Curated annotation (Swiss-Prot):
Keywords: Acyltransferase, Lipid biosynthesis, Lipid metabolism, Membrane, Transferase, Transmembrane, Transmembrane helix. GO terms for cellular component: membrane. It comes from Arabidopsis thaliana. Pfam families: MBOAT_2. One of its GO terms (molecular function) is long-chain-alcohol O-fatty-acyltransferase activity. It is an enzyme of class 2 (transferase). It is a multi-pass membrane protein. It catalyses: a long chain fatty alcohol + a fatty acyl-CoA = a wax ester + CoA. The gene is AT1. This is Probable long-chain-alcohol O-fatty-acyltransferase 1. Its main location: membrane. One of its GO terms (biological process) is lipid metabolic process. It comes from the Eukaryota. Belongs to the wax synthase family.
Length: 341
């Protein structure tokens, strides 16, 4: 375990040095091709660094923060776009905004749509989610006696809780260090009433925002020249889901170290097609919208079933979940040892 921590420290020291270079050197170059060329070596390095990590959690977090978020934000920064423009006044802010899923919370206008400006998670809800995750980890000891569908449901719940809690912790630390309020990353996705609501307004909002800036808007702008406005919008939706699928394939490659099977890409392409179809049906107003409870149940069922079928397939086949659960239990054991000493 000591070697894994040492590798993690070395990876992030390299990342911090690279981001400092972007802040002090690349930012001084004119926007466009010249700045892009200066940033590309950093983007390539951020694709290589996770290969030095064997711990599932360290690897997954580093891929999300460096290979995905930082690379996409730096590409936007090359053209004076995205959250890194205008250039933050301090290096610490530049680093946080570049590689972390954070956004400074703005006070919404009175006429703003509530779901587009989610409220911070109440402390009691956070406590309940931590408790549920702890119970889940203990239930795993008895999973051999549980029905298969129950175990798979527990895996889905585990992924959601752990991803959200890790990002909430990161946001809390950054909020304290920078002295500012941070936008919530999740907005209770289990309350989604449509796929559009789930992916656009509730699940991993910072990744959705980055995909919107780097993929959806440019693709939509390009296809407006040759397609109708609706057709261009649907092209942007499909492109965003496709790129998200490719990035998840990259994430799985780092964790599994085997060639991609493209199942997770199929998952996101399927959801992109379903979301685009859902939007098209809503615009035609052919069907009366179902009750929120009914539509919410349909959305959760669709996400869960397709998630087990395509999203989790590689993870389960290569026993990555067993390794991840083992790492979580190790953290619990260390916490117990620390509190008892």
């Amino acid at each position: 375990m000591e070697e894994k921590f040492r590798n993690l420290i070395e990876v992030w020291i390299s990342a911090l040095i690279s981001l400092s270079y972007c802040y002090y050197i690349s930012s001084k170059l004119s926007k466009g091709v010249l700045r892009l060329l200066s940033i590309l070596p950093v983007c390539i390095l951020f694709l290589v660094l996770p290969l030095f990590l064997s711990c599932v959690h360290f690897c997954a977090i580093s891929v999300l923060f460096l290979s995905w978020l930082a690379n996409f934000k730096l590409l936007l920064f090359a053209f004076d776009e995205g959250p890194l423009f205008p250039l933050p006044p301090k290096l610490s802010r530049f680093i946080c905004f570049a590689c972390l899923p954070i956004k400074i919370r703005q006070d919404p206008s009175p006429n703003a749509i509530p779901n587009l400006h989610p409220k911070p998670m109440p402390k009691w809800v956070l406590a309940v989610k931590i408790l549920v995750l702890g119970v889940l980890l203990h239930v795993y000891e008895y999973r051999d006696g549980l029905p298969r569908f129950v175990v798979l449901a527990l895996y889905c719940l585990h992924i959601y809780l752990e991803v959200e809690l890790v990002l909430v912790f990161v946001g809390a630390v950054v909020s304290t260090l920078l002295g500012c309020n941070i936008e919530p990353v999740f907005n209770e996705p289990y309350l989604a009433t449509s796929l559009q609501d789930f992916w656009s307004r509730r699940w991993n909002l910072m990744v959705s925002a980055v995909l919107r800036s780097t993929v959806h808007i440019p693709v939509q702008r390009f296809f407006k020249r040759i397609l109708s406005p609706d057709g261009a919008m649907f092209a942007g939706v499909m492109a965003s889901f496709f790129v998200s699928g490719l990035m998840h394939e990259l994430l799985y490659f780092y964790m599994i170290r085997k060639p991609p099977t493209w199942e997770v890409t199929c998952f996101f392409v399927l959801h992109g097609a379903a979301t685009a179809t859902e939007i098209a049906v809503k615009r035609t107003q052919w069907l009366r919208p179902p009750h929120r409870a009914v539509s919410g149940l349909v959305v959760l069922t669709f996400v869960s079933v397709t998630g087990v079928w395509l999203f989790l397939a590689q993870v389960l086949r290569n026993n990555v979940h067993e390794k991840a659960i083992g790492e979580c239990l190790l953290v619990l054991d260390l916490a117990k040892l620390f509190t008892s000493s």
